A protein has these predicted regions:
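N-terminal accessory regions of nucleic-acid-interacting proteins
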Residues: 1-47, 116, 127, 180, ...
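Generic alpha-helix initiation/capping and coil-helix boundary signal
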Residues: 168, 175, 224-225, 247
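Conserved DEDDh/DEDDy metal-dependent 3′-5′ exonuclease domain
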Residues: 22, 26-29, 33, 42-46, ...
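Short helix-capping/linker segments at secondary-structure and domain boundaries
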Residues: 187-197
Length: 262
């Protein structure tokens, strides 16, 4: 039986083994290549889909989607939209109503894709809309994967240049992993829901208790740190008084000087 949590501790993620897409990655940089890739995907039974956009560090400026990654269990195609735009074959893929396209936070991706061209979204399934069925409240891909599979999806490549002339191997593997992971999550969530083969652990919310002044005085003895703080405060008060006397003396001397001048 699998143990899952309603909320996964993000501090535990770094200690988990990293997962990477194990299959073949194909970069699509022409319309003819896109046509072939779309024909392949529409012959499959499921697709994992995600997008990447070049980060903008200028307020109010946002780049268009640069990459559309579409994965099966074995092969992931990376459509370089910054080179080929949105050809008819890609629109046909995104508008299809026969092969389910699994993603996460699809509303954001579709809005971004619409900035390139208008299309009618097809059979999209958002993991965020179904994960609550098994009691999980987290919505990020990294937390969901860590929770359900006990593996880490690294996000180090997320803010790299997705409009580079050539994507490096780390970028390609990262992009493929995100799309492929959506298939794994979707199928495992459905399996757990159908078989009930899991134990849900509800994590208690961390609360900060604020004690009343009297309670704090009764429950705590004065620590050396408190004593030194009080002493420091007294020293500050004495120093302030000394400064005040010095100022008064200076004013008195100034008045004497004015009187003599007259």
């Amino acid at each position: 039986m699998k143990t899952i949590y309603n909320k996964y501790d993000k501090n535990k993620i770094n200690a988990l083994p990293q997962v990477l897409f194990p299959g073949k990655i194909v970069v699509v940089q022409s319309e003819s290549e896109a046509d072939k890739a779309v024909d392949y995907h529409l012959s499959c039974d499921i697709m994992g889909v995600d997008t990447e956009t070049k980060p903008s560090f200028k307020k109010g400026h946002m780049h268009k989607v640069a990459l559309l990654q579409v994965s099966t269990r074995e092969v992931c195609f990376l459509f370089r939209l910054n080179f080929i735009g949105m050809p008819p074959s890609v629109i046909r893929l995104l508008s299809n109503t026969t092969v389910p396209m699994i993603g996460l936070s699809w509303h954001d991706d579709i809005c971004s894709l619409h900035r390139r061209t208008d299309f009618t979204p097809g059979l999209f399934i958002d993991i965020q809309n179904i994960v609550g069925r098994i009691g999980i409240e987290d919505l990020s891909l990294q937390k969901l994967y860590a929770n359900i599979f006990g593996e880490k999806i690294s996000k180090r490549q997320r803010l790299t240049n997705w409009e580079a002339d050539v994507l490096n191997e780390k970028q390609k593997r990262y992009a493929a992993t995100d799309a492929w992971a959506c298939i794994n999550l979707y199928q495992e969530i459905l399996r757990l829901e159908a078989e009930g083969d899991f134990k849900l652990v509800k994590v208690k919310e961390k609360t900060v208790e604020v004690a009343a002044p009297n309670d704090a005085a009764n429950d705590k003895e004065e620590s050396p740190k408190d004593v030194s703080s009080e002493a420091a405060l007294n020293d500050k008060e004495v120093s302030s008084k000394d400064n005040q006397l010095t100022l008064q003396e200076m004013l008195a001397k100034a008045k004497e000087s004015l009187a003599m001048a007259k």
